[in-house]
Amino acid sequence: MTGDKDPQSVSRPNYGSISHPPSSEPQQEPLRTTYLSEKIPIPDTEPGTFSLRKLWAFTGPGFLMSIAFLDPGNIESDLQAGAVAGFKLLWVLLWATVLGLLCQRLAARLGVVTGKDLGEICHLYYPKVPRTLLWLTIELAIVGSDMQEVIGTAIAFSLLSAGRIPLWGGVLITIVDTFFFLFLDNYGLRKLEAFFGILITIMALTFGYEYVVARPAQVALLQGLLLPSCPGCGRPELLQAVGIVGAIIMPHNIYLHSALVKSREIDRSRRPDIREANMYFLIEASIALSVSFFINLFVVAVFGQAFYQQTNEAAFNVCANSSLHDYAKIFPRNNLTVEVDIYQGGVMLGCVFGPAALYIWAVGLLAAGQSSTMTGTYAGQFVMEGFLRLRWSRFARVLLTRSCAILPTVLVVVFRDLKDLSGLNDLLNVLQSLLLPFAVLPILTFTSMPALMQEFANGRLSKAITSFIMALVCAINLYFVVIYLPSLPHPAYFILVALLAIVYLGLTTYLVWTCFIAHGVTLLAHSSHQHFLYGLPDVEEKGKISG
């Protein structure tokens, strides 16, 4: 095993050269027709000094990225964590957010240093078959995330209309509102980023209101936040802890963030400018994810205070004796612990704290669904253009993604019930966790390559932390598989699972192999994969590499 600074990696021409910005294609018109069509200029300030003006110029991509930490899937995971474990899992939420920040830091750094997003670099470095499989997994993650947004938005419309808008009607409304929000592109990048900021503010105010009225016990809350323990916890709490990690770190978000940072004008021929951009993007991402953490904390704390170990019978009685007594029927009359979801959670808030709490909850849920819709659209566009070099209009792209998301959701709503819809939301959180290696492994691979990143390649500490994240994710996924296999309804499903597992493990093994090569394990470097050690020669940079 050799060190990271192989001398050949310095002397050979490479894709990530800072003095000569790379280009994977001959000079063409830009592929982007949205977001990246406009570049935000960075003001000149005195070198070596911190500038709020400059921080403001860099502010935007991190907050758009943070919306994936606040989508309806996260909200459902939060409220279930509170209802199942009280405040005991707040420390898991905290450290999952920190791990998410570390992954997003790598994504931003890759985009700043190379001038290309993760999808584009995957297109350059991976052969056709693994590249195509990798693209399909990320598209699956995007569709899964979009399904969660459809579910959350539909439930929000149902709550706001007091049930007058059926769930299937709310699902269909999401088709229209998505295209409406896409028109925001026409009003400029900063206005679009400001709109996302407004949606995040709405979530902070609405869920913060619930936190204030619930008045959680602050001492117990701080203990749950700062002490990494879970006294008296069993399998349900462990499953919920795993669900928190799966909901927080989203695979498509890593691809998204690496593209969003390209919206700022950065002189990549100057190392100080790159170093400065990395610093400001890290500060902005830290602020954005701090805001998202507190919003998630509000939700966990509210349900941990009001609904921890609550029984269905108690929930029924509370609602039956409130002004929202018509909703009491959604809780079965038994002594089992209530299994809350984003619909029942809103109803319970209204029953306990008054109707205003229900409607405010629904507004926050609507903001979460709508903001996630837009970022999911951008992620899909960046991933498709990066991997396939295929240019689609944003309308065609969102129509494809939303159609794939709406069809299964409508089928569940029409032929099953609300409980199955919420169960689908939980299953989608599991899916995001299973697909996470297909984002973390590539970002760890490419940000660890000195030939690509030069002096900005990962150091030993960064490699160790990211490798720990990868090992944690793999352990979580293995645990999920062991837990869910016995619940398969028919032996024939085992054949399907086995076939999918072969593809999954094969692609994961390939990505791990190339990751080791990028870390300097030269013994594994086949002649066809030398570019993971030394970068791409000029002929490959010009798009002439085959496969």
From Swiss-Prot:
<dbReference type="GO" id="GO:0015086">
    <property type="term" value="F:cadmium ion transmembrane transporter activity"/>
</dbReference>
<feature type="topological domain" description="Extracellular">
    <location>
        <begin position="416"/>
        <end position="432"/>
    </location>
</feature>
<feature type="compositionally biased region" description="Low complexity">
    <location>
        <begin position="21"/>
        <end position="30"/>
    </location>
</feature>
<dbReference type="InterPro" id="IPR001046">
    <property type="entry name" value="NRAMP_fam"/>
</dbReference>
<feature type="glycosylation site" description="N-linked (GlcNAc...) asparagine">
    <location>
        <position position="335"/>
    </location>
</feature>
<feature type="transmembrane region" description="Helical">
    <location>
        <begin position="55"/>
        <end position="75"/>
    </location>
</feature>
<feature type="topological domain" description="Extracellular">
    <location>
        <begin position="215"/>
        <end position="240"/>
    </location>
</feature>
<feature type="transmembrane region" description="Helical">
    <location>
        <begin position="241"/>
        <end position="261"/>
    </location>
</feature>
<feature type="transmembrane region" description="Helical">
    <location>
        <begin position="493"/>
        <end position="513"/>
    </location>
</feature>
<feature type="transmembrane region" description="Helical">
    <location>
        <begin position="140"/>
        <end position="160"/>
    </location>
</feature>
<keyword id="KW-0813">Transport</keyword>
<dbReference type="Pfam" id="PF01566">
    <property type="entry name" value="Nramp"/>
</dbReference>
<feature type="glycosylation site" description="N-linked (GlcNAc...) asparagine">
    <location>
        <position position="321"/>
    </location>
</feature>
<feature type="topological domain" description="Extracellular">
    <location>
        <begin position="486"/>
        <end position="492"/>
    </location>
</feature>
<feature type="transmembrane region" description="Helical">
    <location>
        <begin position="287"/>
        <end position="307"/>
    </location>
</feature>
<dbReference type="GO" id="GO:0034755">
    <property type="term" value="P:iron ion transmembrane transport"/>
</dbReference>
<feature type="topological domain" description="Cytoplasmic">
    <location>
        <begin position="186"/>
        <end position="193"/>
    </location>
</feature>
<keyword id="KW-0967">Endosome</keyword>
<keyword id="KW-0408">Iron</keyword>
<comment type="similarity">
    <text>Belongs to the NRAMP family.</text>
</comment>
<keyword id="KW-1133">Transmembrane helix</keyword>
<feature type="topological domain" description="Cytoplasmic">
    <location>
        <begin position="514"/>
        <end position="547"/>
    </location>
</feature>
<dbReference type="GO" id="GO:0005384">
    <property type="term" value="F:manganese ion transmembrane transporter activity"/>
</dbReference>
<comment type="function">
    <text>Macrophage-specific antiporter that fluxes metal ions in either direction against a proton gradient. Localized to late endosomal lysosomal membranes, delivers bivalent cations from the cytosol into these acidic compartments where they may directly affect antimicrobial activity. Involved in iron metabolism and host natural resistance to infection with intracellular parasites.</text>
</comment>
<feature type="topological domain" description="Extracellular">
    <location>
        <begin position="161"/>
        <end position="164"/>
    </location>
</feature>
<feature type="transmembrane region" description="Helical">
    <location>
        <begin position="347"/>
        <end position="367"/>
    </location>
</feature>
<dbReference type="GO" id="GO:0016020">
    <property type="term" value="C:membrane"/>
</dbReference>
<dbReference type="GO" id="GO:0005765">
    <property type="term" value="C:lysosomal membrane"/>
</dbReference>
<feature type="topological domain" description="Extracellular">
    <location>
        <begin position="76"/>
        <end position="81"/>
    </location>
</feature>
<dbReference type="GO" id="GO:0031902">
    <property type="term" value="C:late endosome membrane"/>
</dbReference>
<protein>
    <recommendedName>
        <fullName>Natural resistance-associated macrophage protein 1</fullName>
    </recommendedName>
</protein>
<keyword id="KW-0410">Iron transport</keyword>
<feature type="topological domain" description="Cytoplasmic">
    <location>
        <begin position="103"/>
        <end position="139"/>
    </location>
</feature>
<feature type="transmembrane region" description="Helical">
    <location>
        <begin position="433"/>
        <end position="453"/>
    </location>
</feature>
<feature type="topological domain" description="Cytoplasmic">
    <location>
        <begin position="454"/>
        <end position="464"/>
    </location>
</feature>
<feature type="transmembrane region" description="Helical">
    <location>
        <begin position="82"/>
        <end position="102"/>
    </location>
</feature>
<feature type="transmembrane region" description="Helical">
    <location>
        <begin position="395"/>
        <end position="415"/>
    </location>
</feature>
<keyword id="KW-0812">Transmembrane</keyword>
<dbReference type="GO" id="GO:0006828">
    <property type="term" value="P:manganese ion transport"/>
</dbReference>
<feature type="topological domain" description="Cytoplasmic">
    <location>
        <begin position="1"/>
        <end position="54"/>
    </location>
</feature>
<keyword id="KW-0325">Glycoprotein</keyword>
<dbReference type="GO" id="GO:0006826">
    <property type="term" value="P:iron ion transport"/>
</dbReference>
